[in-house]
Regions:
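Short, surface-exposed tryptophan/glycine-enriched loops
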Residues: 153
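Extracellular loop and loop/strand-boundary signature of outer-membrane beta-barrel proteins
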Residues: 49-52, 87-92, 133-140, 176-182
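N-terminal secretory signal peptides that target proteins for export/translocation
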Residues: 1-4
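Bacterial N-terminal signal peptides
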Residues: 6-17
Length: 201
């Protein structure tokens, strides 16, 4: 729950400047009928990886997304991310997390060129990491399991089809403990990306 609290704080500080002037799209008149709007994005990802020793390991990497906005409120996204660190908890073993997720996106409010989004994603994540066992011994390897993410953020159009997205997620993954039993990991992910929009929303 501490991780969920951190995600909530991050999202609050991202959207707080908009709340005094926000316009809820549910009260807006319907726009003229248009087809779906496609978007693609790429950017930087930071992952605070939960370990079984309750220490967090910071991983850095890249994130790429594809979006389809069906209307002003709802869309779908496909998310792929890769983050890496050279040394996990002093074991000398590198660590990385590769995720492929998809799910719905909801846009509850917008103001001018800025809109707020929330999403629920599910898919698989591969976690390659290590767990200290005793002394200089450690258990290392890769685990691929079901994974999901809950989060949101802010998107702002900067010029023509270009926009900037900043968001945060609670990301649930799985890795082994020192006895090789599978355990859940509660991770925090922050993503900053450039968005290119194919069409007008």
């Amino acid at each position: 729950m501490r991780v969920m609290g951190k995600v909530a704080v991050c999202i609050f500080f991202l959207v707080a400047p908009l709340l005094a002037q926000v316009r809820f799209v549910t009260g807006a008149p319907p726009a003229a009928a248009t087809g779906p709007v496609f978007e693609a994005s790429a950017g930087y990802s930071y992952l605070a990886l939960d370990t079984l020793s309750r220490q967090r390991v910071g991983l850095s990497g890249v994130d790429a997304n594809g979006f389809v906005d069906f209307n002003s409120r709802w869309g779908m996204m496909v998310d792929s991310s890769y983050a890496r660190v050279g040394n996990v908890l002093g074991t000398g073993h590198s660590g990385n997390v590769l995720s492929f997720l998809t799910g719905p996106v909801f846009y509850p409010a917008e103001y001018g060129n800025t809109r707020i989004f929330v999403h629920t994603l599910a898919g698989v994540s591969l976690v390659n990491s290590a767990v200290p066992v005793s002394g200089t011994y450690y258990l290392g390897g890769a685990v691929t399991r079901f994974s999901y993410a809950l989060g949101g953020g802010v998107e702002r159009t900067v010029s023509g089809p270009l926009a900037i997205r900043v968001g945060g997620d609670y990301l649930r993954t799985t890795f082994a403990n020192s006895t090789a039993a599978m355990q859940f990991q509660n991770n925090l992910r922050i993503v900053t990306s450039i968005v290119f929009r194919f069409g007008r929303r």
